């Protein structure tokens, strides 16, 4: 065999080896991307955002046009399907004004308006948002404000009314009841900010573990957002009833509405 033939074969061998090496590197890179860099199905799902439908946007625009015309401090609307809790929500710079000030601006003790804590973001984006309202039943025979929140201290009522809906000018938020606790008026649980995820989970964990009325097998997670409906107990003005609710994540809203849509629809009960 000539030197030329040997050289030619050697060149072909080198070319083939180079092609194989490139293929191996490319294939390895693909597997690394799939294993470590490419977003998983769960991650993509968790990052999904909720977009209000045109129908929902029109409904909210019409509703809040009237609400904001009556009270420019309106930030939302809260109702609990199957109950008579059906109230606009306001926010101002303090937590005292709306204890007596009605939604239309008239002062009426024991009525007032449901209001968001002054330290919360009005778009319900905080990890823990507080709404406050009177329970009027012992003083006035009606279901206005947060009277119906007190009924959640009975497990059967809690189980029968698991969802709360918050409407804002931009969209709806859906919540599921997690726990109902009765606490002193000056409880340390009244917080709107936390040091870190661990601090948040610790407080929510204590609340869930000590609650006598709750949804079973709930795992508190710092990834979730919570809403609290807080009101006084009719039998004792020094204690409070706090209903804790978990916000349905945007990644779950579409399926949640498909499953529960009819029972979540707004049905007015205000006189």
Which residue stretches match the model-derived regions?
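N-terminal Lys/Arg-rich, disordered targeting/topogenic segments
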Residues: 1-12
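Hydrophobic membrane-insertion alpha-helices, especially the h-region
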Residues: 16-31
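Solvent-exposed, non-transmembrane regions of membrane-associated and secreted proteins
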Residues: 28-271
């Amino acid at each position: 065999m000539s030197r030329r033939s040997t050289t030619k074969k050697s060149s072909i061998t080198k070319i083939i080896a180079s092609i194989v090496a490139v293929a191996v590197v490319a294939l390895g890179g693909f597997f690394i991307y799939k294993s470590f860099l490419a977003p998983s199905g769960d991650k993509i799902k968790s990052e999904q955002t909720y977009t209000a439908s045109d129908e929902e946007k029109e409904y909210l625009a019409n509703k809040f046009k009237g609400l904001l015309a009556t009270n420019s401090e309106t930030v939302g609307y809260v109702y609990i399907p199957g109950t008579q809790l059906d109230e606009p929500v306001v926010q101002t710079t303090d937590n005292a004004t709306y204890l007596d000030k009605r939604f239309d601006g008239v002062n009426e003790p024991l009525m007032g308006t449901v209001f968001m804590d002054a330290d919360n973001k009005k778009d319900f984006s905080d990890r823990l948002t507080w709404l406050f309202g009177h329970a009027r039943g012992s003083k006035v025979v009606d279901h206005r404000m947060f009277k119906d929140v007190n009924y959640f201290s009975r497990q059967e009522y809690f189980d029968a009314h698991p969802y709360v809906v918050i409407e804002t000018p931009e969209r709806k938020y859906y919540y599921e009841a997690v726990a109902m606790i009765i606490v002193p008026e000056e409880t340390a649980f009244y917080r709107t900010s936390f040091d870190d995820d661990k601090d948040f989970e610790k407080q929510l964990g204590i609340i869930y573990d000590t609650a006598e009325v709750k949804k079973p097998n709930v795992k508190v997670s710092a990834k979730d957002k919570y809403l609290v409906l807080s009101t006084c107990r009719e039998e004792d003005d020094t204690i409070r009833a706090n209903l804790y609710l978990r916000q349905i994540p945007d990644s779950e809203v579409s399926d949640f509405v498909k499953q529960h849509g009819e029972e979540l629809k707004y049905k007015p009960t205000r006189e």
